[in-house]
Amino acid sequence: MIIYFRGDSVSRFINHIGSFFPKLQKDFKIYTGDIFPDVYVGDFYDKIPYEKYINYNLSFNLDNATYVKDFGVIPDNSCVNNAICINNAITKCNETGGGVVVVSGGNYTCGTVYLKSNVILYIDKDSSIVASHNTNDFTDNALIYAENCENIGITGPGKICGEGNYFSLKPYCPPKLEPFSETLDVWSLRQEYRKRIRFPHKTKYGYLMLLKNCNNLKLYNLILENSAMWTVNINSCNSVDISNVAINNNRHVANSDGIDICGSSNVVIKDCFISTADDGIALKNNMSVSTSGDDGLKIKNNLDVTCRKGMSNIYIHDCEVISCTNAFKIGTETSLDISDVTVENCKFYLTDIYPAGVSGISIESCDGAKVNNINISNIEMNSMACPLFIRLCNRNGDNKPELEGRGEITNISVNNIKADNIEIPIMIMGIPNHKIHDVNLKNFDLRYAEGKDYYDFRFKIPEQEKEYPECNRFRNINAYGVFVRHAENISLENIKIKPRKNTFRKYKKIIDCKNLSIK
């Protein structure tokens, strides 16, 4: 039996009969086609306050610097691969004790550029490194690559451009620039976004930047644009400082995460602006080869981005994130432990295209990781559908017997959250016999988007224990405020939520929760 409180057409009934049969629901996806380089209005965010984040007049000591123009580079010619020339300049700088390699005087098309120890890559104002459109020019699945290096840096105020449009398929629909005329159910909102995704073409080269097993790494005063996949992949590194970086991606290119910290510790991300299609800032820690997420393309050479140890001491503050999916996320790849994470004084939003972003804050352990001591505070959101999604499941994406049922989420503190135009309640979801522990939420001020409430009644919300974890996969939840299932020691204090005026849903729905405190 399905009871609808709005909508009486047969087509609406048929579209939502999947409430009882979730396996019948399939995500929209385009698998084949030609490269589609055209840019629609709404693909890029056109109001990035670069002057707030980028210092175009930053003084830099260029005494004894190495200039790429002395190594035969040819600017402003998209048919020329300048990677060999730039790599020769970097090698020369490294072999003479290190220093600064200067990219100036134009835009340089490149395949993979390799950083080396004790070298800072400086991209001057009005200059850039631009990804070649020939996938054969990339030898390590990234435009900028470093491995086993120390004391390296990349700075601007110039740009690194990934040319993501040239490695993607045509979307089914162009960006939606106006709100929907009526309230859609959560699953339909998910599909409306997916119809606008530029899914990967088989030629996709990989990351804009992959920095692997490096120590003492700095990215600062730099503009990154139009990544074809993850923009910054910091993998198995230690002592990382990312500051005053502006990321401006096409907001419909699949898997174009902003900053992904994978298996790395002692990381600071501050004063950054990120506008992207996929996760804004993500923390991941997995054992095996990455497949680049739910819609990922296994990139050539089966690139190993394996993380081999627990990660800790991550501090993120004073950042702005525009994301069509998750603004801040722990997950999904989570087979090894993540702990001691602080996120504060950030803004998460998506206010100029529709539908809303998936979630503002997402904390997940789905492959066996112990996620512990996560502290998030002073966050403002607008048009992020779910303000907070905490999910413990048992996907075990690495297929390791020792990880089966090992995962934990404990000691989570989220305070002082203000969010407008939400669509989904706070969700805290473990699985049977495997609970989330010790979650403290305090001082939330949440307001639903305008419109009539959409509501479908189901006797049972599926566990989806082995599925990809995302809040909108559970469709409409029968509570507007808080949904808690399989949890213990949960504290909710001063959680204010303004629902839609006509809602039939109750404030909370609690299933299998021990020691719940509401003040």
Q: Which functions belong to the PLM regions below?
A:
Residues 388-389, 403-415, 464-476:
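Generic long, charged, amphipathic alpha-helical segments
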Residues 2-28, 40-120, 124-213, 218-220, ...:
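Extracellular "leader-to-stem" segments immediately downstream of a signal peptide or signal-anchor
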Residues 359, 364-365, 372-389, 400-405:
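Eukaryotic tandem repeat interaction scaffolds
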Residues 125-126, 150-159, 215-225, 238-250, ...:
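Right-handed parallel beta-helix
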Residues 8, 34, 281:
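Active-site glycine-centered loops adjacent to acidic/histidine catalytic or metal-binding residues
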